[in-house]
Regions:
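Conserved HGGG/HGGXW glycine-rich cap/lid loop of the alpha/beta-hydrolase fold
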Residues: 2-43
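Residue in the alpha/beta-hydrolase core beta-strand immediately N-terminal to the catalytic nucleophile
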Residues: 35, 72, 95-98
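The alpha/beta-hydrolase serine catalytic core
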Residues: 107-163
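Gly/Ala-rich beta-loop-alpha elbow adjacent to hydrolase catalytic centers
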Residues: 74-75, 79, 83
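Flexible "cap/lid" loop of the alpha/beta hydrolase fold
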Residues: 48, 88-130, 180-187
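Short beta-strand/loop motif that positions the catalytic acidic residue
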Residues: 170-172
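Active-site loop/oxyanion-hole signature of alpha/beta-hydrolase fold enzymes
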Residues: 30, 38-71, 88-89, 114-117
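Conserved loop-alpha-helix segment in the C-terminal half of the alpha/beta-hydrolase fold
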Residues: 174-208, 220-221
């Protein structure tokens, strides 16, 4: 049995991973889709102080509270920042990492520095409304909520590399529209024999567009 913690991307809550989590449980695994502070059902906690450190702490605290010691962390999009930070904080609790069309930061990186120009425009385009939140894009699921801007701007601080973990998978959405901020991470994974790199016929929302293929990749991490 493998325990998965599933971390959504910007503006999304645990709901975006719940169908996948149900299928993982049907295969005998534990699965914890998480809603980060200030988002989804926790949107009432959104304020200017919520940042990347807050979201890393969300995951670290979940691992401690549930006494999870061999987790596979799965991060979609922005969630790649979060799982990297959490794995660095408590490497003794982490067995593997799966980046789903996600950022794979190095020390000092942020979403802002890794993003495309279009993404940076989105991050700050509607922030003037309250000064601290990025609005969901029009085509997002109706359940999407504003995302704390500070978490997209803050640089990550890491003490070690990803070579500490047994398995590392990168899932690239090969049919995304326009310039992809995630292609460089996929290409690095493809060239590194310590990674397993997967290109799926999917747009960015892989959980929705390629659920069967993503499930197979996650199940393979537990083999």
């Amino acid at each position: 049995m493998t325990t998965f913690v599933l971390v959504p991307g910007a503006c999304h809550g645990a709901w975006c991973f719940e169908p996948l989590a149900r299928r993982l449980r049907q295969h005998g695994h534990e699965a914890y889709p998480i809603t980060l502070t200030g988002l989804g059902a926790r949107k009432h906690l959104l304020n200017a102080s919520v940042n990347l450190d807050t979201h890393v702490a969300d995951v670290v605290n979940l691992l401690a509270d549930e006494q999870i010691t061999d987790v596979v962390l799965v991060g979609h999009s922005y969630g790649g920042m979060v799982i990297t930070g959490a794995a660095d904080r408590v490497p003794e609790r982490v067995d593997g990492l799966v980046y789903v069309d996600a950022f794979v930061p190095e020390d000092g990186d942020s979403c802002w520095t890794l993003a495309t120009d279009d993404q940076r425009h989105w991050y700050i385009g509607d922030a003037h409304a309250n000064g601290y939140a990025t609005a969901p894009l029009p085509f997002f699921d109706p359940r999407a909520t504003p995302h704390p801007l500070a978490s997209l701007i803050q640089s990550i601080r890491l003490r070690g590399g990803l070579d500490r973990f047994r398995s590392k998978d990168y899932v690239y959405a090969a049919e995304g529209e326009g310039e992809s901020a995630f292609k460089p991470a996929y290409e690095r994974a493809l060239a590194d024999p310590s990674w397993r790199a997967h290109a799926l016929a999917s747009r960015h929302n892989v959980m929705r567009d390629a659920p069967d293929e993503l499930l197979k990749i996650l199940l393979a991490t537990s083999a």
